[in-house]
């Protein structure tokens, strides 16, 4: 690859440092972008993504509006390396049936995804403790390959007769056998289990039977290792999806990246992961994700609108893990946080003109005007459909 030199915009003040990231390693320190809607975040993200693609890097871009995905796709010359995922162009991402992972690793990944889904959509997120227990036992009990999917898991959580059938496939007297034998027996603890299972199933039922069905039923079709090794581009357009579907799909992909960082070896090629409106993938583990991904040559670029969207402790942990910060026009609270960092007044931040931003790369602060979008209007084209020769993966769990 030729020399890496990502310019973020035009220099507004000649006394400031040139707004350039001149080392690919600095991208693995991650980038945080904040600003009100319509101030230029999307244009900056599109510029950064296009640069990385032209540098032949593997890229994942998660876009809740879909417009940026379309503009980026339109600007890519070699579309053979692009996978465009949308409600009209689904790809199966089955966290219950992935090749090359131990069952405990799959359990961990899926529970992280459900944690975020339940936390963002439930008034009782504390129930996730019991949820972890139930999901872990369920995934470790499923033996038939055709049952390793969310559709069957949902039935298992809802119907006692399905649990009895599953118990019959287990070794009598084993811990898993005893767990399901006691699950539906009378008792306050068991009542809580059944109630929790039904709450989780209600969310999974919507996913496994609604608009997301084509994303979750079948053999897993997305391998992050393959995407990185082949330097492919994954554009994820979550527009036209309901909120739960958007949360679930975004987290499926982000926490697949976490599993890639933790368990896949070696990490030869870099991967850039862009998440616009990243509050829908935030969890207590997110700071760990940023810290671990750095050593795996994975750089995250996270954008959102205001602090109210993310719990304070998680936001603070994110600030401690990013090497580049970009602040467009923002509210008073956000301006108060960033003004001392950039060495300016709060009014300088919440009065920034459109497409202007303060940038901190390492320890250098710069006021910039971001580059104008190369494609202003959203292209009108038929959303690409993934071909049938998509590389399917195996469906074996590794014994432990």
List the model feature ranges, each with a label.
Residues 19, 98-109, 149, 380-400:
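Alpha-helix capping and helix-coil boundary motifs
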Residues 1-4, 307-400:
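C-terminal regions of RecA-like/P-loop NTPase motor modules
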Residues 64, 298, 303-309:
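Conserved H-loop
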Residues 2-17, 24-26, 31-298, 314, ...:
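P-loop NTPase motor domains
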């Amino acid at each position: 690859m030729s020399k890496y030199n990502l310019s973020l915009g035009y220099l507004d003040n000649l006394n400031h440092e040139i707004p350039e990231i001149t080392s690919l390693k600095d991208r693995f320190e991650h980038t945080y972008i904040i600003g009100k809607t319509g101030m230029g975040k999307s244009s900056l993200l599109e510029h950064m993504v296009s640069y990385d693609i032209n540098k032949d890097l593997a890229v994942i871009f998660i876009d809740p509006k879909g417009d940026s995905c379309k503009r980026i796709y339109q600007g890519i010359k070699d579309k053979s390396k692009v996978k465009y995922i949308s409600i009209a162009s689904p790809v199966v991402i089955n966290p219950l049936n992935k090749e090359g992972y131990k069952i405990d690793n799959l359990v961990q990944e899926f529970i992280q995804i459900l944690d975020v889904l339940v936390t963002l959509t439930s008034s009782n997120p504390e129930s996730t403790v019991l949820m972890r227990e139930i999901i872990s036992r369920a995934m470790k009990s499923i033996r038939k390959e055709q049952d390793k999917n969310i559709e069957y898991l949902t039935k298992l959580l809802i119907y006692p007769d399905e649990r009895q059938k599953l118990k019959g496939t287990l070794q009598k007297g084993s811990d898993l056998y005893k767990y399901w034998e006691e699950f539906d027996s009378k008792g306050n603890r068991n009542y809580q289990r059944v109630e929790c299972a039904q709450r989780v199933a209600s969310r999974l039922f919507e996913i496994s039977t609604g608009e997301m069905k084509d994303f979750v039923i079948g053999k897993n079709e997305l391998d992050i290792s393959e995407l990185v090794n082949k330097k492919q581009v994954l554009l994820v357009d979550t527009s036209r999806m309901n909120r739960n579907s958007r949360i679930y799909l975004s987290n499926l992909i982000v926490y697949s990246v976490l599993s890639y960082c933790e368990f896949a070896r070696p990490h030869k090629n870099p991967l850039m992961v862009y998440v616009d409106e990243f509050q829908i993938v935030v969890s207590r583990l997110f700071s760990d994700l940023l810290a671990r991904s750095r050593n795996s040559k994975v750089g995250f670029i996270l954008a959102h609108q205001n602090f109210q969207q993310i719990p304070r402790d998680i936001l603070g942990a994110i600030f401690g893990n990013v090497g580049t910060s970009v602040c467009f026009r923002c509210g008073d609270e956000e301006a108060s946080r960033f003004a001392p960092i950039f060495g300016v007044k709060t009014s300088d931040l919440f009065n920034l003109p459109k497409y202007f931003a303060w940038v901190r790369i390492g320890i250098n602060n710069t006021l910039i005007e971001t580059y104008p979008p190369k494609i202003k209007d959203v292209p009108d084209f038929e959303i690409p459909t993934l071909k049938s020769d998509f590389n399917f993966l195996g469906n074996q769990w590794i014994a432990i």
